[in-house]
């Protein structure tokens, strides 16, 4: 029989509490949740209040234009369009003419480009003639007094391509571009027989006439045999050397080696190209290098000194590198035997690895006992907690009374062990 749990001292926190929470999602109940929490709580929607800039605005909604007609008409005219935005004033909706607009004063009225669109956006000829006059119709030959303009030398423009020099210093012609009036000439219909011009056959330019003599692609005939694909610049060397694979048809000759021929490799068939055709061709050389290398030993032709017996071959002696070095025999009695052949690399980069018994480290003497770490020192009852089975009753005694009652109300099987005498096994 388990004893009664300690209730503890009654505190204002316990008095204000509404008891343990039965919701498993609220296992870690806080003081605020137990004191002020309510089930199905929904926050109330507050009213939106304007910021401090709201008082700076003029109440345009309640403003009427007739309020300033008597009191302050000047201010009424200034703030007449304050309620309209710039976008609504500039981008007004499309207005279609309904026939109530007044007639224009002039039939050829000039409007801006931002006005009502016209079918013909170009200017009318009558409007152009008011500003410009055609020198072909009203030039110096037609109207007296319109002679070519003479500009003083000081005011003349020295730059090339000036439009004021065209058409007798009257500017470009009427409704023509600068290019048409300056550079395009009318070709005569009748042939000019007096100039005695003859037109020959069409020839290639310098860029294409000598294209076959390109030093990169073209080679002179002396550098290649007739029929060599190098002579054809349009054909690449890759296509001429790497031909497609051809399967045997059955009519090919069998690979038979003729009697008395050299077993040369495929590299021996080399066509040597003469750089200078005037130089005579050298004597035929053996084609294969392996044929000369792998030959049986032959007796060399003796010289006159060898025939007279004046040539002698001595014993083989060591070279200067081995003759100057004494015989290296390591003696166990030498103290500096390791320093005898000490190089610069060994002096600068020596080995700091311990040798002998110092190299064994922790493995010397068998397995070392484990030392307690920071985690083991901070937990005094580490072995007791890991070995023993947790007791719910002892856990409730060490907890806060309110937390203990909450655990007992949420889980009724938490207090006693499942296999205790309180829960007998069913037979």
Swiss-Prot record:
Q: Which GO terms describe its cellular component?
A: axonemal A tubule inner sheath; cilium; cytoplasm; sperm flagellum
Q: Compositionally biased, Polar residues: which spans? A: 287-298, 321-332
Question: Which compartment or compartments is the protein found in?
Answer: Cell projection, Cilium; Cytoplasm; Cytoplasm, Cytoskeleton, Flagellum axoneme
Sorted keywords for this record are:
Cell projection, Cilium, Cytoplasm, Cytoskeleton, Flagellum
What would you give as a GO molecular function for this chain, any one?
Answer: phosphatase binding
Q: What is its main location?
A: other
Which Pfam families does the UniProt entry name for this protein? Answer: PPP1R32
Biological process (GO) annotations? flagellated sperm motility
The segment annotated Disordered runs over: 82-105, 273-298, 314-335
Superkingdom is Eukaryota
Subunit structure of this chain's protein:
Microtubule inner protein component of sperm flagellar doublet microtubules. Interacts with PPP1CA.
Under what name is this protein listed? Stabilizer of axonemal microtubules 4
Q: State the organism of origin.
A: Mus musculus (Mouse)
* Gene name linked to the record: Saxo4
């Amino acid at each position: 029989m388990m004893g009664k749990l300690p209730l503890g001292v009654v505190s204002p926190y316990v008095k204000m509490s509404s008891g343990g929470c039965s919701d498993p999602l609220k296992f870690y109940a806080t003081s605020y949740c137990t004191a002020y929490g309510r089930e199905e709580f929904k926050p109330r929607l507050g009213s939106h209040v304007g910021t401090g800039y709201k008082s700076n605005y003029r109440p345009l909604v309640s403003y009427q234009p007739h309020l300033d007609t008597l009191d302050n008409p000047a201010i009424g005219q200034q703030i007449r369009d304050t309620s309209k935005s710039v976008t609504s004033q500039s981008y007004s909706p499309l207005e279609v003419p309904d026939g109530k607009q007044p007639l224009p004063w002039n039939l050829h009225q000039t409007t801006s480009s931002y006005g009502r669109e016209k079918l013909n956006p170009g200017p009318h000829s009558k409007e152009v003639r008011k500003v410009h006059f055609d020198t072909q119709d009203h030039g110096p030959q037609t109207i007296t007094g319109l002679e070519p303009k003479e500009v003083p030398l000081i005011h003349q423009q020295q730059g090339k391509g000036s439009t004021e020099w065209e058409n007798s210093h009257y500017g470009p012609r009427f409704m023509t571009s600068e290019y048409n009036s300056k550079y395009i000439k009318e070709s005569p219909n009748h042939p000019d027989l007096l100039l005695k011009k003859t037109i020959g056959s069409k020839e290639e330019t310098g860029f294409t006439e000598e294209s076959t003599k390109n030093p990169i692609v073209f080679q002179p005939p002396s550098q290649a045999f007739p029929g060599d694909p190098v002579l054809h610049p349009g054909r690449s060397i890759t296509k001429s050397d790497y031909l497609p694979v051809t399967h045997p048809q059955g009519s090919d000759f069998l690979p038979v080696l003729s009697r008395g021929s050299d077993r040369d490799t495929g590299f021996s068939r080399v066509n040597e190209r003469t750089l200078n055709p005037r130089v005579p061709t050298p004597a035929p050389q053996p084609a294969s290098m392996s044929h000369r290398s792998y030959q049986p030993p032959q007796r060399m032709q003796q010289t006159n000194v060898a025939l007279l017996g004046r040539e002698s071959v001595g014993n083989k002696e060591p070279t200067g590198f081995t003759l100057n070095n004494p015989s290296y025999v390591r003696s166990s009695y030498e103290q500096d035997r390791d320093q005898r052949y000490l190089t610069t690399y060994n002096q600068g980069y020596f080995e700091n690895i311990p040798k002998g018994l110092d190299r064994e480290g922790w493995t010397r003497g068998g397995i070392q006992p484990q030392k307690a770490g920071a985690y083991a020192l901070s937990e005094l009852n580490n072995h007791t907690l890991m070995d023993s089975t947790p007791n719910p009753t002892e856990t409730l005694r060490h907890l806060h009374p309110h937390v203990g009652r909450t655990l007992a109300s949420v889980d009724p099987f938490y207090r006693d062990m499942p296999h205790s005498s309180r829960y007998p096994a069913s037979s």
